[in-house]
Amino acid sequence: MSFRGGSRGGRGTGANAGFSGGRGGFGGRGGGRGGFQQRDNGPPADVFAMGSFLHASEGEIVCESINTKIPYFNAPIYLENKTSIGKVDEILGPINQVYFTIKPTEGIQATSFKTGDKFYIGGDKLLPLEKFLPKPKPPPGAPKPKRAGGARGGRGGPMRGGRGGGRGAPRGGRGGFTPRGGSGGFSRGGGGGGFSRGGGGFTPRGGARGGSRGGFSRGGR
């Protein structure tokens, strides 16, 4: 999946110029899901090698990932001695060759590092790569997984009801309980079970944020 915004020009070198990952890659800045925003509580007990310095660009540090996992956006980045030097700003490139940029903290110069210098991250700020890979399709004839949501409703109350039954309940106009064993739960306009506006399950407003999430993405997977 890709995040909001494209990769900044001039960040890449050679064949990786721009680090545009195309389909299934990472590109751009994080906002929305996957971003990490909280107070700085100091360095973690353990840090793990995250990236290797490539070059400085526009005041930021461009790194090649040397970790099999994906960092959170805005995750603190450290030196091996746990000195904080900045935060993850962008994640770029295809999912099998990830790059990321570090926005240095005040007083840290991106040009003060040299090629091959290592940067580290706390283990709790990493996500497994599998989270961003498409799920395999079930074999033909395999039973479909049941949707989470309300159980199938019974017959409900009488069709006509007494006084106060409300017009439109039998016709399924404005929500309410569907009278004849409908799809269960509360629904606007039928559809699958659970709470829904025209579709099955839970449907968040606006769908998944941030587009398709084939790589590091913030929307659907």
Swiss-Prot record:
Keywords: Nucleus, Repeat, Ribonucleoprotein, Ribosome biogenesis, RNA-binding, rRNA processing. SUPFAM superfamilies: Translation proteins. Residues 1-42, 130-221 are annotated as: Disordered. Disulfide bonds: none annotated. GO terms for biological process: snoRNA guided rRNA pseudouridine synthesis. InterPro entries: Gar1/Naf1_Cbf5-bd_sf, H/ACA_rnp_Gar1/Naf1, Transl_B-barrel_sf. Signal peptide: none annotated. The keyword Lipoprotein does not apply. The keyword Electron transport does not apply. Residues 4-35 are annotated as: RGG-box 1. It is found in: Nucleus, Nucleolus. GO terms for molecular function: box H/ACA snoRNA binding. Residues 152-220 are annotated as: RGG-box 2. It comes from the Eukaryota. One of its GO terms (cellular component) is box H/ACA snoRNP complex. Belongs to the GAR1 family. This is H/ACA ribonucleoprotein complex subunit GAR1. It comes from Botryotinia fuckeliana (strain B05.10).
